[in-house]
Every structure is written in structure tokens, then in C-alpha cells.
Regions:
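Catalytic cores of secreted/periplasmic lytic hydrolases that degrade extracellular macromolecules
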Residues: 19
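Nucleotide-activated chemistry modules centered on ATP-dependent adenylation/adenylyltransferase
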Residues: 1-13, 22-243
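The Walker A (P-loop) glycine that initiates the GxxxxGKT/S ATP-binding motif of P-loop NTPases
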Residues: 16
Length: 243
């Protein structure tokens, strides 16, 4: 509904890690585009560029890195086949912000829960540069993120803090003329997995591969991908995508 109502041509930027939440987010956007294309003659919404932006830290788990590369290639191919304005972009940290320069060259400790320097240097900064380029060119940009309140109490507080009652968009906390939209923020974990398992991937990828990556990353909790949401339940082993 929001995609149909937005009459501007400001680009949409989807943060895509290849994980379950960003996969569901892109799935819903893709299905919305298909519906608009089917139901509307020469829809102006299809003239708005939608960028699927994936950040490559260059130190990802090889299994996940290979999976993400294959997914991105399939997204680009299928978008061109369906003539949808979806474009894949990969960002990388600059040399001075890279993992090995910081750990070996500057003596930084390996990122941990208390000091996750990699998030800013290797993920936020590269993506922010791309967003700034789009804002400079188009005046404004909208970032779509796959964050959910049910992820954690901390995440729920963060979402609530930045929400504006009655508004879909919130101002980006740092970047000017940039707005944030979180379409799946109210989804529970089981709803995310239901979408992944019940709806075929619009770009033609096998979603069972993603399911198995999470399952295999949780050897002592192999049913995690289908767990009924419970606040006392921990995250899925080492299945986090990205830094």
C-alpha cells in the first residue's frame, strides 16, 4: 500500500544481508511490485529505482559468502527478466577500515559483544557512502530495513524510540534527507519462517538452502528455524549474517 501511495521518485534502498529478515523484506517488496505491474497500466511506481544493497566485509564465513553471492546474482537476473526496477549493489569497506588492517596493522582486538568496531567501519560506513550518493543525486532516499521488535528487548526499545505515531517513515538518525521504513517490524519469528517456507522465492532461489544454513549453524538447537517465538529463547547459534 505504501509503495503504491508514494508518488515520489526518491530511490528505495533495501539493506540486504541474505539472512531471514532481509529475505522476507525483499520478498514482500518484490511481490508488491509484481501486483502493481499487473494491476496498473504504465505504473509510475516502476520508474523508482529500488537498490538491493549488500555489504561485503570481505571476512564473511565462506559458506554464507558463497550463498549471498549466488542469491544476488539470481536477484539481478530475475529482476531484468521481469523488467522490475530492482538493482543489486555491493559495498565494501575502504582499505583503512578493513578487518586485517585494523586487527594486524592497528592492533584492534577481534570484534566482540563489548567492542564491535566492525559494525561501523566495515558495514555502516560503506553503505552510508552509497546512500549519500543517492541523496546527492535524487535529493532524498528511503531505506527499507528488516528489523523486528521481536528480535530482542533492545531492538524493540530502539524501534519504539524512533517511531513517529501515525507515520510510516522516520528520519534517519545521522544521514540528511534520508528516511527509514521498517515494513516487517511487527512480525514474529514464526511468521518470518512461515513466509520463507510457504512462499516461493520471487527471484527463483531455493529457500530451503537458507533454512538449512540456519539449522546447520545451530547444531545443539536444530529446530531453531521453526521455533515458536519465546522471549526466553536465545538466538540461533552462530547463524548471524554479517558482522
Amino acid at each position: 500500500q505504501y509503495m503504491y501511495a508514494d508518488t515520489s521518485f526518491r530511490p528505495w534502498i533495501i539493506g540486504f544481508s541474505g539472512g531471514k529478515d532481509s529475505t522476507v523484506l525483499l520478498t514482500l517488496v518484490w511481490l508488491a511490485l509484481r501486483k502493481i505491474k499487473k494491476d496498473t497500466i504504465a505504473p509510475f511506481q516502476l520508474r523508482r529505482p529500488i537498490y538491493v544493497v549488500c555489504n561485503d566485509t570481505m571476512v564473511e564465513n565462506p559458506i554464507i559468502a558463497t550463498y549471498v553471492d549466488e542469491v544476488l546474482a539470481q536477484i539481478e537476473t530475475k529482476a531484468r527478466e521481469e523488467d522490475l526496477p530492482i538493482f543489486v549493489r555491493k559495498t565494501e569497506p575502504r582499505l583503512g577500515d578493513s578487518f586485517w588492517v585494523n586487527v594486524i596493522g592497528k592492533g584492534y582486538p577481534v570484534p566482540n559483544t563489548a567492542f564491535r568496531w566492525c559494525t561501523d567501519k566495515m558495514k555502516i560506513k560503506p553503505t552510508a557512502r552509497f546512500i549519500i550518493e543517492q541523496v546527492d543525486e535524487c535529493g532524498e532516499a528511503i531505506i527499507l530495513i528488516g528489523t523486528r521488535k521481536a528480535e530482542s528487548a533492545t531492538r524493540a526499545r530502539s524501534i519504539k524510540k524512533h517511531e513517529v505515531y501515525g507515520k510510516r517513515l522516520t528520519n534517519h538518525t545521522i544521514l540528511r534527507n534520508t528516511y527509514v521504513y521498517a515494513p516487517i517490524k511487527e512480525l514474529m519469528l514464526e511468521e518470518v519462517w512461515y513466509i520463507i517456507n510457504a512462499i516461493p522465492s520471487p527471484w527463483g532461489f531455493d529457500n530451503s538452502i537458507l533454512f538449512n544454513i540456519y539449522k546447520d549453524a545451530s547444531a545443539d538447537d536444530y529446530e531453531c528455524p521453526t521455533v515458536v517465538t519465546d522471549k526466553s529463547h536465545g538466538s540461533c547459534g552462530q547463524s548471524r549474517f554479517g558482522c
